[in-house]
């Protein structure tokens, strides 16, 4: 049974363009400091905030599925597959299936925030595939009410957002103060959770705003709010069933 909480101060950090964009990183790149190394089929996770309008220049990717989830404001995306800029706003999401290779650039408006999460879909399969891109709008994601809790399904059965990476489900929870939301976990699943707003307790362990939680070998996760809160959930397999790039890096 394992519940691990990492406050923002205990996460890795980074910046672009002289601090115009700042990041905290629950899962950093292998050469960076972060409290967690890649696990499951999660390779990288950063929470980026734009302090000014700023552009991250064109840069390449291969193999990974790189997802951006817009939390606030507006971002714009350009890549060598689309050859055009596309806007994304709060609640929207995108995936770059980088396959055999693609280059992209991002613009973030002042005050915007997003998660960028890299999933490992088994690079031995995807490095030979053509690259592709999809974006999805907030209104495309189904929502359900669980009592007073609103659950938005971003990735999983019933959502149009698809990944080659197996076994991934992504949810966005809006929870009023004093409520408890229960999530059942299969023995082969892990739950990665980020407190976007507010403050919660995961199985009675406190997690403030911007905290990251990793929960494994827990048959049930109870998320209890201390104040009105928004929480981002990723469910993924504890063992993906293939050799991940992160595992290879850790053996070096």
Tell me what each language-model feature is.
Residues 1-252:
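Jelly-roll (double-stranded beta-helix
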């Amino acid at each position: 049974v394992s519940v691990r909480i990492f406050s923002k101060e205990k996460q890795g950090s980074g910046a672009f363009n002289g601090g115009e964009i700042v990041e905290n990183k629950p899962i950093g790149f292998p050469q960076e400091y972060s409290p967690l190394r890649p696990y499951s089929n999660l390779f990288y996770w950063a929470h980026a905030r734009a302090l000014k309008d700023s552009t991250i220049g064109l840069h390449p990717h291969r193999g990974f599925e790189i997802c951006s989830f817009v939390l606030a404001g507006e971002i714009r995306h350009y890549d060598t597959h689309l050859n055009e800029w596309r806007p994304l706003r709060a609640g929207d999401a995108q995936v770059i299936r980088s396959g055999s290779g693609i280059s992209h650039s991002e613009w973030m408006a002042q005050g915007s925030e997003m998660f960028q999460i890299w999933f490992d879909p088994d690079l031995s399969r995807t490095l030979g595939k053509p690259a592709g891109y999809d974006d999805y709008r907030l209104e495309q994601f189904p929502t359900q009410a669980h009592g007073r809790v609103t659950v938005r399904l971003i990735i999983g059965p019933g959502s149009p957002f698809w990944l080659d990476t197996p076994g991934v489900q992504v949810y966005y929870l809006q929870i009023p103060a004093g409520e408890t939301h229960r999530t059942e976990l299969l023995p082969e699943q892990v739950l990665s959770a980020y407190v976007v707003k507010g403050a919660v307790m995961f199985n009675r362990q406190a997690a403030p705003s911007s905290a990251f939680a990793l929960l494994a070998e827990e048959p049930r996760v109870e998320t209890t709010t201390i104040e009105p809160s928004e929480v981002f959930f990723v469910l993924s397999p504890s063992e993906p069933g293939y050799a991940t790039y992160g595992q290879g890096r850790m053996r070096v």
